[in-house]
């Protein structure tokens, strides 16, 4: 038994020595003899104790190294902070610029609200109107020109009704219109212009001396008022004088509307544009007239002369639309046999459904009703009485001529 134990102890000793070498311990005789004396279980506990002790020693040996690393890290942080401080110092100007930008932004918003937008707008509008008003104030030379024109007009009107004088008055009124058109108060300027235009037409038709005298008196008062411009009260006085003058002119007799021609108690309008026969009837009806119906040889000669003088093909109110070959006027009356002499040679021939009559050259011709031609409207002239009561009453309104 003793012999067998010895080799086993030797083997155990060798094993323990190998394990201790693996853990970094040096072999000693005392430890080896101690291991040989101890059992296998206590040996494991001893090994664990030595292992823990060795690990603790290793950690303790590393502490100075960790402190050194921390110090290096702090030095690096310090250097970074130093560099950052220098960089921040360079950014001070930029931050100030940013601050200025923000201040300007706030100032812009504040100025946008000062003092009250509505009041600023109102002030702007008032200044704009004031500028326009000042720009329209008449120059003294213009006022003097108006005064001179009215003085001349007064003398000219007193010498009516010579035709040359009427023409001269027309030219003077045209110049007066341009001068008055520069006065302030634009709406009243326009009204003055329109009134002077109507006055021009009325003066051109004046035959009665009493009416001339009335206009002379009105113009005399107007001259006195214009001579004292540009005071606003005087301008108002001129406006009132022109209003009175308008009333006087409206009481004058106008047998025919403007741009119509008077002949034997009727008014005639010769168009400046072309329409077909049916549309020509409509155009005349719109102004209280009808496509011309010829009632006498004198009227025929007058109208034929008007048409041939302008070298136009012009519709009249005659057709055979209701029954081929039976010619009838638009008022329903038949064509009298005595009027058949006015047809041109070989007419009417009804070539290609020609059912409407026209003035052509020195006579009449039939043509297609859908062709566009000039036309003539006819209506009765207004009666002009010399009775004073009739003279003082306003003339009936006359419609404008049809679209030319």
Curated annotation (Swiss-Prot):
Residues given in the record as Ca(2+) binding sites: 347, 349, 351, 354, 365-366
GO-annotated molecular function: carbohydrate binding; D-mannose binding; metal ion binding; pattern recognition receptor activity; peptide antigen binding; virion binding; virus receptor activity
Tissue: Predominantly expressed in dendritic cells and in DC-residing tissues. Also found in placental macrophages, endothelial cells of placental vascular channels, peripheral blood mononuclear cells, and THP-1 monocytes.
Keyword Oxidoreductase listed: no
Lineage summary: Eukaryota, Metazoa, Chordata, Craniata, Vertebrata
Record PROSITE patterns: C_TYPE_LECTIN_1, C_TYPE_LECTIN_2
Key word Glycoprotein present: yes
Topology, Cytoplasmic side: 1-37
Free-text domain note: The tandem repeat domain, also called neck domain, mediates oligomerization.
Membrane spanning stretches: 38-58
Organism domain of life: Eukaryota
Effect in UniProt of substituting residue 324 to A: Loss of binding to ICAM3 and HIV-1 gp120
Annotated ranges, domain C-type lectin: 263-378
Further remarks about this protein from its record: In vitro, is a receptor for HIV-1 and transmits HIV-1 either in trans without DC infection, or in cis following a DC infection to permissive T-cells to induce a robust infection. Bound HIV-1 remains infectious over a prolonged period of time and it is proposed that bound HIV-1 is not degraded but protected in non-lysosomal acidic organelles within the DCs close to the cell membrane thus contributing to the HIV-1 infectious potential during transport by DCs from the periphery to lymphoid organs.
Covalent S-S links between cysteines: 256-267, 284-377, 356-369
Designated name of the protein: CD209 antigen
Annotated source species: Homo sapiens (Human)
Glycan attachment residues as annotated in the record: 80
